[in-house]
Swiss-Prot record:
This is Glucose-6-phosphate isomerase. The active site is at E353 (proton donor), H384, K512. GO terms for cellular component: cytosol. It comes from Solidesulfovibrio magneticus (strain ATCC 700980 / DSM 13731 / RS-1). One of its GO terms (biological process) is glycolytic process. Pathway: Carbohydrate biosynthesis; gluconeogenesis; Carbohydrate degradation; glycolysis; D-glyceraldehyde 3-phosphate and glycerone phosphate from D-glucose: step 2/4. It holds the Pfam family PGI.
Length: 549
């Protein structure tokens, strides 16, 4: 396998960047009135406009050459075929099987996984039906009104993001809660809002040993039993998303209510699996299935569209262009939709845990930057917070803008106001405002020359800040599924070009091991001297503080 810098297209892109790095998008648009038509794609009713990027036809040609030289198509086909592309863990990567609505056989070690996938989906459908109909009763005979999902990482971020995104589809009478942090405040404050008689807890841990999740799960169980009394009642109020039947049964959960998933499902790609049970309970199983349909639409597009017309490929290549040739360190995801308030946070994990790597698939350290820092907030809030830096700062921050044409929560002219900002921001970031233009706007002001010079520069915008725009009819379950899957495949494309394994997460392990050691040291008040002087000092000061006055 070749590293990014070993491909002929890389050298060509370095030379090309030297020639075009000072080109301004204002001039590119002025020279080509058809730029939007040429540099936009559609999938269903989703419009992807990438015309406001610092690219020429030659740039794109070289980027597509890079994708072909890096083997994006072959590796994509290997993933869909169930090959073990996660080399460090010797696993297949098959979140795509979870939304394989064509039910095509997908083999792992000669075994078709689709019957297992369909079995769990049917189990989820039946369970959701029982809860939503009121047939599932708590220990006192009352129906379930609150669902508390206890998980962390992919077992929390995805379900929470999707449930918030689809809040307008919420099942009447069901309130969803999510607990992830081992900080006791998260669990305590959640339990204060629910009743043991009508609450269902979902424990999401594949191994049923995840430290934070199981600490919270046992606290929830203790709280429940303190009020319910009978341990047999646990089975009416707790279900598990796990594969460890022995531990699940020991906890008191009926293994008939254990929903399985597989080692070829990575945590940050798991909302399509049984991990999505909390989504299905929140918005209805039919809407969960619509998410799967939307993701399948993106999968089929990714599998079949030529690279030049392939949305995730274009997304990934543009990110490579800015990351590896312009030196951009971050990417902002800016949804102009309050329901997507956790979308950027979800892809912080999705992207940064996937591509925050420095070792290639054949064990060499890379000599180039890999995963970008992902961040963002919904518009228009961000405009009054951090857009100042995006517009006038010295950092290049490529941005993705997302918006729905129609809202399910109409209020006066709010949607037009929201979308006017959506359109204006991408135009402003592209065009900017020259010093001369700013000076002309100040012509009617009574200003001294020095003040006029100062304000003309302060009110100028360099522009040439790249953006992608996603515009779609409405944020419904299918559209949400498509958007998520497009970003998943973008991550895949970039990981392939960087020649890294996007599907392990070794970087989270060291801290967990050290935390286990320190936790034992916190069992007493004796000073520690087993670490570096900074860590010793912090631990010892904590011990002093917790003793109180």
């Amino acid at each position: 396998m070749a590293q990014l810098t070993e491909h002929p297209a890389h050298s060509a892109l370095v030379a090309h960047h030297e020639r075009v790095r000072d080109l301004h998008m204002r001039d590119l648009f002025a020279a080509d009135s058809g730029r939007f038509d040429k540099l936009s794609l559609r999938l269903g009713d989703i419009l992807f406009d990438y015309s406001k990027n610092r690219v020429t036809d030659e740039t794109l040609g070289l980027l597509f050459d890079l994708a072909r030289q890096a083997g994006v198509e072959a590796r994509r086909d290997a993933m869909f075929a169930g090959e073990k592309i996660n080399r460090t863990e010797n696993r297949a990567v098959l979140h795509v099987a979870l939304r394989n609505r064509a039910n095509r056989p997908i083999l792992v070690d000669g075994h078709d996984v689709m019957p297992d996938v369909n079995k769990v989906l049917n189990q989820m459908r039946i369970f959701c039906g029982r809860v939503h109909s009121g047939q599932w009763k708590g220990y006192s005979g009352k129906a379930i009104t609150d669902v508390v999902n206890i998980g962390i990482g992919g077992s929390d971020l995805g379900p929470q993001m999707a449930s918030l995104a689809l809040a307008q589809y919420a099942v009447p009478g069901i309130t969803s809660h999510f607990v992830s942090n081992v900080d006791g405040a998260h669990m305590v404050e959640t339990l204060q809002r629910v009743s043991p008689e009508t609450t269902l807890f979902i424990i999401a841990s594949k191994t049923f040993t995840t430290l934070e999740t199981m600490a919270n799960a046992h606290d929830a169980r203790d709280w429940f039993l303190a009020q319910a009394g009978d341990e047999a009642a646990v089975a009416k109020h707790f279900v598990a998303l796990s594969t460890n039947a022995e531990a699940v049964a020991a906890f008191g959960i009926d293994t008939a209510n254990m929903f399985a998933f597989w080692d070829w499902v990575g945590g940050r790609y798991s909302l399509w699996s049984a991990i999505g049970l909390s989504i299905a309970l929140a918005v209805g199983f039919d809407n969960f299935e619509a998410m799967l349909e939307g993701a399948f639409l993106a999968d089929e597009h990714f599998r079949s569209a030529p690279l030049e017309r392939n949305i995730p490929v274009v997304m990934g290549l543009l990110g490579i262009w800015y990351n590896n040739y312009f030196g951009a360190q971050t990417q902002a995801i800016l949804p102009y939709d309050q329901h997507l308030t956790r979308f950027a946070a979800y892809f912080q994990q999705g992207d940064m845990e996937s591509n925050g790597k420095s070792v290639t698939n054949d064990g060499r350290f890379v000599d180039y930057t890999t995963g970008p820092i992902i961040w963002g907030e919904p518009g228009t809030n961000g405009q009054h917070a951090f857009y100042q830096l995006i517009h006038q700062g010295r950092k290049l921050i490529p941005c993705d803008f997302l918006a729905a044409a129609i809202t399910r929560t109409p209020l006066g002219r709010h949607q037009d106001m929201l979308l006017s900002n959506f359109f204006a921001q991408t135009e402003a970031l592209m065009k900017g405002k020259t010093v001369d233009e700013a000076r002309a706007e100040l012509a009617d002001k009574v200003l001294g020359e020095a003040q006029l010079e100062l304000l003309s520069k302060a009110k100028s915008f360099t522009g040439n800040r790249p953006t992608n725009s996603f515009l779609y009819r409405v944020l419904d379950p299918k559209t949400l599924g498509t958007l998520i899957a497009l970003y998943e495949h973008k991550i895949f494309v970039q990981g392939t070009i960087w020649d890294i394994n996007s599907y392990d997460q070794m970087g989270v392990e060291l801290g967990k091991v050290l935390a286990g050691t320190i936790l034992k040291e916190l069992e007493n008040d004796a000073p520690v001297a087993s670490h570096d002087c900074s860590t010793n000092g912090l631990v010892n000061y904590y011990k002093e503080l917790r003793l109180g006055d």
